[in-house]
Amino acid sequence: MAKQFIYPFTFGDKSQSDLLGGKGANIAEMVQMGLPVPPGFTITTEACREFLSSGTVPAQLTEQIHKSLSNLEKAVGKNFGDPLNPLLVSVRSGAKHSMPGMMETVLNVGITPEVAEALAQSSGNQRFAWDSYRRFIDMFGRIVCDLPDEIVHKIENSFLLKANAKVVADLPVESLKELAQQLILAIQEHTGQDFPKNPIDHLTQSIEAVFRSWNSERAQLYRRRERIPSDLGTAVNIQSMVFGNLSDDSGTGVAFTRNPATGEKGSYGDYLDKAQGEDVVAGIRNTMSLADMAKKEPIVHAELERLMKTLEDHYRDLCDIEFTVERGKLWILQTRVGKRTAEAAFRIATQLVDEGKISMDEALLRTGGDQLAQLMFPQFDLSESRNLIATGIPASPGAAVGEVVFDSKRAFDLAKNGRKVILVRRETSPDDLVGMVAAEGILTSRGGKTSHAAVVARGMGKTAVCGTESISVD
């Protein structure tokens, strides 16, 4: 009997994270709850383990991908790779245990120059179409083809300087088209092969890249630190795209049902209009708070607050939620029980007991000795006068002192020799994990409360300040 490597989002629930991964299991749970989740399917952790063991995609998996893609096309009424009515998908990792930012994601899979041109015509928005195409080429190049970040940044910076723009998404439409072509040329030079043109090849190669990312250096480092077994593998979630970069009433965000840094009640998170999801966690642009989102999009914000309460009541815990707004419609992309600081863990557990959502015994099980030790984090003596250089967002509490270091590898090398360091970056990426682990604290000039630096620092119990806009980091 053939193994089943793929399940639609309509199958399963949150208890099946061994098979579907945490993300896939929680997506299935939300579908069962009737929440607005873009349709898709999950490739199981077993498929990943077989791929990593053999080095090739199982033949049965290839057949099941084609069948599942056909079923998804029927569900959404669009066709993958068809310029007249295109279906685009995201390809995202989803291991049993949350590993924020440690594995890979490829967005806008299925887009080609022909599809981009058709999207520009049908949406009436050239920028949206070609920005989406540029984003796909960028991600495919770095993640699938191993194009070094330095090459990507060098090409992007040349366009930014020429256009006097701060971020790539602000480039003129013609520059976005030209940038995508320059990236393709760089990919071809780097790989020695022609850039694939068939969207099915884009999809299968993206899936393989996500499988491989389970064994990336940073993923292995994170697993060792968090004591996550190395033989689990990751599931892969294929989800139909909804576009936060489509229009003025579109955007993307990350929300927590309570403050993951302090445990205070009340929604907490970041929102970016005219953006795609990776922009928020990457910290490339400074975000607006959910309170500011409420002023800009009051109806959508009210719906988000309602769904946040629904999810927290259902999970009986702090929930971390990724969402996208497309032309005023709210979509929930994923949820998980959110990582939090030790202070927040104790406060939230106490609150949930007081609210009758969990028992005292369950609250004790949710708090451990490691978190108790973290509660003793140092603080500065505020009674002494200090020269304040800059202020930012208190992403993870505590106080830290050390040499300022701008490079993660150097931070690691200095810390290995017994020197205390503060890692200072414009924004952190998953590749900075080695420096973040080594540093006493983390400071970024960009990013918000849910950026990569903030989420990872909270999970590790590291002091972090993000979005210090008055500091310029070269």
Label for each model-derived stretch:
Residues 461-462:
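Residues forming the flavin
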Residues 397, 401, 415:
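NTP/phosphate- and nucleic-acid-binding module
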Residues 1-387, 413, 419-422, 427-434, ...:
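Nucleotide/phosphate-binding sheet-loop regions of phosphoryl- and nucleotidyl-transfer enzymes
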